[in-house]
Amino acid sequence: DNVLTSYSFLAALSENETDIYKTVYLPLFKRAISSYAAKKSSKESNSIQGTDIDIQSIILEEYGIEVPILIVRKLIKAVGTSLSKKERNIFKFDTFEDGKAFQFTNYNYFSTEEIYDRERRNAQALQQAFEDYLKSENLSEKNIPSFSQFIDKNKCNLSSFFSGKNCLIHDVEGSFMAHVNFLQHIEGGYHYLYQTAERIYLGSVIASFLETGVDLESKIDDNIIYYLDTQIVLEALDLQKAEDTLPTQELLKLIRATGGKIRLLDITINEIHKIIELAINNYSKSHPTTTVNEACVRIGKNKTWLISINGKLESFIKAELQVDIDGILETKMNLYSRSEDVNLLKQTRIHKSTAIHDVAAYLHVRDRREGNIRLFQKAKYWFVTANKKLADFNISRKTNGFVNETIMPEELTSLLFLKNPQKLAKKVSQIGLNELIAQTLSEEYASKELINEIDIAIKESADLSAEDYNILFSSIALQSTNKIQKLLEEISDKRKFNESIHNLIEKERTKQAKSKEEKIQRQKQFEEVNHEKLSLE
């Protein structure tokens, strides 16, 4: 698979290096121009001509990376200036119109072929292992997205963030659970394959930098302040899903290791208090009703423990996570609460009060920055959230050309990689792949809170019989987080919402009827076989 090979190749080039531009981008373009030269015949002419579009197409075709044309021109020029005097005399390499065009009599570049061939073998071994795993689990490849699509989803998300736009990321038909299960399978007994997966993940991060033209020369300062959103705090405390705990805790370590400061806002403490209070009021050991409740059962904590920590929540969190708390002035909160952003975000929320918290948090960051920032590395304050819809909303409400205030864990991990690529490559690839696994699980399995939200919405907006309600929830229990969220987005259009609900009911009814019929047929066949055996006896 070209994409897997490409990402593994990029990561291998960056290994033990500090300058990604010189050690990754430049060799990539030298190899692309060499490939272009090999495809062109110089028999009819003494020289070969090409354009920026030609090299852009080669990079996309051979590596699956869409490099902006201005970056292509810059790197074409860089290839020319990187040549020694002897090479310039041999190749007669010239560029024109600031990198728009080039010509040479001959050009070849073989310095990285050994690395490329090795990474191609590694990528092919991983792909083959994935295909073998699907067969062992009796899963059809036709119904499962490719492994490159799983990794590419991460690159697309990162490219969206670094471009500062809500880029359209095409939904892939099928679940990515097989990919997560495969990674968990090889992590224990097939360490070499898992290392390849980590390397490919890191390559996808580097590809996102190249696709969006991230300024690699700009360095990240120390003492940057990171405010944590509610869910991030709960994950760090191991009070959310089990798979979210380690990646979040590792991210906090990475922030500190790169000179960052972790803080919470007082409004976030208040929001966490309400969430824990809800878990206390509805606590059940046998049938957990909230994610916090579910986590307590998993880690062996009871209702009394929850009551205890909620009574001293601020001091508990400060001690557990070693963080400071910042307050927002009442006058500022009043100002933030009246912003247009709050009203717009409320329209997308079941729980309207959460919109005030989220908008106030990123507007506080905006104020603390004291002006618009154009480079990600120069932002002194961030609001770290796991809420993709909030992150997208923030991007839509920022000033074009400037950096948004929210950042998701996988985006922050990738950004921190630029602090010291040589030192942080292994750690970032480990944390990042774990974050991708956790994010995939979150997208596949709806939280207790999301199930409760859709339940409330159905009861308020749809008139269903008891039978239809039970059939509907048999279906919803199997739906992914993304599908349930899309259903919730239709609440404002009652007709469309009800239409979608009844479509789910009919599909589930048909599915159950088919299952029942198949069961009857199997029972009938079983009885016929038994009857034949008795007749023979």
How should each PLM-predicted stretch be described?
Residues 382-386:
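Acidic beta-strand-to-loop metal/phosphate-binding motif
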Residues 43-49:
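Short helix-capping/hinge SLiMs at alpha-helix to coil transitions
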Residues 1-41, 52, 58-66, 70-381, ...:
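Active-site-proximal, substrate-binding regions of enzyme catalytic domains
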